[in-house]
Amino acid sequence: MTAFELTRRDALAGLAASTALPFLSSPAFAQATAADAQANALLDSIAENLLRFYPQTATSLGIDKDARAAMRAQLDDRSGLTQQRIAQTLRADLARANAIDVAGLSHSTRTSVEVVRSAYTTALEGFRLPYGDVPVGSWRNTPYVVIQNVGAYLDIPRFLDSEHQIATAADAEAYLARLADFPQQLDNETGRVMMARYKGLIPPAFLIDKALTQLQASAKSAREGGGLVESIERRTREKNIPGNWAARARAIAQKEVAPALERQIAELTLQRGMAKNDPGMWAQPSGDEYYRWALKASTTTTLSPDEIHNIGREELRALQGRMDPILRSLGYTNGTVGERMQALGKDSRYKFAPGDKGRAEIMAFIQERVRIIRTKLPQMFNTLVKGNLEVRRLPPEEEPGAPGAYGGAGSIDGTIPGKFWINLRTTELHTKFDLPDLTHHEAIPGHVWQGEYANKLPLIRTLLSFGAYSEGWALYAQQLADEFGVYDDFPAGRLGYLQGLAFRACRLVVDTGLHSKRWTREQGVRFFVDENGSKAEEVASEVDRYCSWPGQACGYKIGHTAINRERDKAKAALGARYDIKAYNDAVVLGGNVPMDVLAKNVDDYVARTRA
């Protein structure tokens, strides 16, 4: 890890001293061999080569300091030329990773090598496609560089406000430097959107409409100063940092950011006149090829669209079979499971108040559910992390195109907490029976919790992730909450959990339906409403998300099923020696991996337990 290694060692030492957690004694952190040291030095070099393209990630991880201090004033370069440079770097570093002899390596180091090989191979396949964004080792592969839930216009304002910390005048100067680069990154993406148009790629009209609404709101905010100015003004005032920060930020926002947003609006307005309403990749040039790759990237498997579609229908039937008796016990006896879940969703006992009163209720409700689940964690894991968590509302201008919530871990050193972002555009999006499950998925023991373990791994492992693992773990986290009793006195909450799993089974059906079976957008929405009792307003945004992130929705249930399959295998192999806490440690300490590597990690856990 070169310059990064001392920082991580200090962080781990501080963690161990302050919390007395058994992290460093884990097999995942066993003493490295000489061969490991050589391999890890190469992997550290590969990590640094990747990180230099993503200075925003360095800030989010809290490692934009010392040798990387210049990154603190930089944004990710979103130009087409830089995409080519990333691909060139991946090709060279994949060759280096492939040349490592894994025979003499420890299991943990061998896992890191396999992770790099898998992530880089898949990313390079994506870069060979004629369009789209290919975030390396990430979950947001998309054919559309700017759309309702993708683009610098969304990412950078949120990043500047929530990830770029301001404690000194130098931090404020770095904020302004990044803000000054924002227009260039908008133009870089506008140029790539134009190039995609020349290749025949036009997003569906209904997605462009959403994107234009949000872009127009962003442009209006920039012309007025808005959040880009308020963020630095508020935080420099709170820290008593003298300077004309607000005036400088306002000049950039009004004179540079707003015109760049207007240029992006003009391009998408042009494309709106050419757009159709076909939602799936089947309607796009090279769309079938793109979708096959997107499924592989999301699931880390070679399952076909038809296979995934059928898995979704089978798992949905099984989950509805578990929901039916609970619904009957609550007095909901008439109609399909989906119809009865719709009725449950209208039950006033489970609704939040409208408006700001209900928004406050939701935030308090989440905090209470986090408190409850924290008491269960020592029963689930031998190795614990802090679970550094902040619950925040999504920026209102982002909410119309966003899902109900999302979350992720904070910085390596803990200075930036993990975030649970909740969409509160209307309190009708959430109920008291489904919000606990959402909290377990996004926060603890889901994304925020798992991400903290990943932050203790070598840097390359922190940078690379796989949707099937990330989302599969988050679903497994929901399952653990149920298995450890959080719904024992709350049957409606258990229904919310099962509905959440069924929702992910529906995703397998709808995603493949849209992109492979030529479903309409309306068919996708109706499937969720009819089969799972989902709220039409919520799933309309969900279906739009599947249209802009093809394949991404399939990683969830495929990953969850794989984690349970490996658990069943470990139980059968170990018998009385099987321990749920040890199994959970093996999965989460093994880090974010493709599903075939997960199986190897579980095999290693079984072998160690038998020894």
Where are these regions (language model features)?
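N-terminal secretory signal peptides and thylakoid transit peptides that target proteins
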Residues: 2-22
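N-terminal maturation segment of proteins
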Residues: 29-611
